[in-house]
Swiss-Prot record:
Keyword Transport in record: no
PROSITE patterns the UniProt entry points to: G_ENGB
Organism, scientific name: Nitratidesulfovibrio vulgaris (strain DP4)
Source lineage: Bacteria, Pseudomonadati, Thermodesulfobacteriota, Desulfovibrionia, Desulfovibrionales
UniProt xrefs under NCBIfam families: GTPase_YsxC
Family named by the database record: Belongs to the TRAFAC class TrmE-Era-EngA-EngB-Septin-like GTPase superfamily. EngB GTPase family.
Protein's name in the database: Probable GTP-binding protein EngB
């Protein structure tokens, strides 16, 4: 099945977050992890989501409707961008947490992880938060084309240890690597086909305060 994305609405404040009965999958990741590029790759369009070499550009919650299936991929502000005020980082952290805790139709959290980097603290915090709150988790390595095969495999193994054996998918927006596999996972997640990890002993808390280094 061929799917694409349509930007339906954007929320910049807590009050602008919308209620949708349709299944939603949140897309989260650090600044400059390649979220916008991945959205464009999923949509097979170059400029649906604006991309930039400068981190800190996505400062809103963007609701993309998946056609023809009808579920939503919701692009959250990125985290870990230090070149903005602490007040602004906290604002976007609250926006992310409010979306996650209030979304009754949230089917899962797709966390984007830079294939070039060892597991980062903020990424580990977010995945632990999801597991502690029984949110089905879909880990996705981005920029796989920037890594050699051995490096990709090593990174998958690193994350598998942290995620109870779950290896992340490897993707590359520029080459299309893993995009078809990612679509299959997203459809399954929207249909309730994936389940949260049973073990969450590594989760530090049931709040998302640890990632208040936010904006992407």
């Amino acid at each position: 099945m061929s799917s694409t994305l349509v930007l339906e609405t954007t929320a910049y404040t807590l009050e602008q977050l919308i209620h949708l009965d349709a299944p939603q999958i949140a897309l989260a990741g650090r600044s400059n992890v390649g979220k916008s590029s991945l959205v464009n790759a999923l949509a097979r369009r170059k400029q649906l989501a604006k991309t930039s070499s400068t981190p800190g550009k996505t400062r809103s919650v963007n609701y993309y409707r998946v056609e023809p299936e009808g579920f939503y991929i919701v692009d959250l502000p990125g985290y870990g961008y230090a070149q903005c005020s602490k007040e602004e980082r906290k604002k976007w952290a609250k926006l992310i947490e409010k979306y996650i805790v209030s979304c009754k139709s949230l089917r899962g959290l797709a966390v984007l992880l830079d294939c070039r980097l060892d597991p980062q603290r903020l990424d580990v915090d977010l995945t632990s938060y999801a597991r502690a709150n029984n949110i089905p988790l879909l880990p996705v390595l981005t920029k796989g084309d920037k890594c050699k095969l051995r490096e990709r495999s090593d990174r998958q193994k690193q994350w598998a240890v942290l995620l109870g054996g779950r290896k992340p998918l490897v993707t590359a927006s520029m080459t299309g690597l893993g995009i078809a596999d990612l679509w299959r996972e997203l459809r399954a997640l929207a249909a309730g086909g994936l389940s949260a990890d049973d073990e969450a002993e590594d989760a530090p808390s049931d709040t998302i305060d640890a990632i208040d280094d936010v904006t992407a």
